[in-house]
Amino acid sequence: MGQLSVLQLIITGGASEREDRSWDKECERYSKEKTIVVPQDVKELFFRRLLGQLIDLRKRMKADTGTEMELRTMVANMRSKRGQLTLQNYNLYTQLRWSLGDELQLGILTWHIATDIYLSQSVKAIVAAVEDAVLARRLKGIRTLSNYMMYLLAVRPDMLPGLVTRKLFELTCENLATFWSEHQTSTSVGAGGDDLESSSSSTRNICRLRDLWRVSPKTIEQQNKLAEMLIKQWEWDRKHESGAVELNKYLSRGIELAKKLLHLESSNSIDKVLQVILAVWVEMLFYAGYRCSKESHAKQLSQGGELTTIVWLMAEHVGLFLVNKTSKGAEEDYWNTRKRRYSRQPASQNV
């Protein structure tokens, strides 16, 4: 399972020090070093959520509480939404729908940056990672899915639907690398130290986070410092509006979302905020798997396959639950639609 954290890519790669950097090579290098076996925790989190959706669907079918159109809409939503359902379920759609972007890839970039910054700056998340095994498991699932989707965007863009936004990714990395290069020497890592109550608690937290994130304590400290500097710069840009903005709009979108998630945390439990973030990532994963082309799935299968391919196969079989529940023609209509979709060939080829 490929992994790529943009903040860690900038911090650990030394890319900011080279003028001839190639983001393709940097991403390949990083992802090879960070590739992991799909954690059991992540499998369970994802499949439990999918199972919950299917159970709800079957309950409605058995109880005949929904019309045929409503049930088909439920199935369609499972295949066509990329975060909208989660935001609607938590009454956040009006406030955060902009963060999903017009294309999946822009949504991934925004939510990935926001996730990295939020997990670095949320004191509640840090405490949860250290003291609560259940929430620590959820945090691990969030970061793993976030890094996986970012890996697909940067290294396997053919596995994602929609317009290729590679240039947006490169511009964001370039902007972030320049920012880190110019600002990392102005403030020493670990200075200030007002995030945690004491040096002993800081050491304990860093050790726990090191085990959870599988990165060095130095990387954790540097990532926290970079996230803190990005938020401060974003706030300064918004306050002064002088036109001399250091952060491009794509990076700014991620920082703005991180700020909103931190604000949401101030009036809600950490559990709820983590549920929102995880649910959005699961929706994006499911959408990416179903909307990716069959050719890309087949090509990747020859190289070992992707998690999104497993998701796609599951999505293809969701329609099997529409059997004799709402009307006599439901199953027939479903399979006729599938036949038309996969059997569109010129008449001359069928002679």
Cite the ranges covered by each PLM segment.
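Extended, charged interaction scaffolds in large complex subunits
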Residues: M1-V351
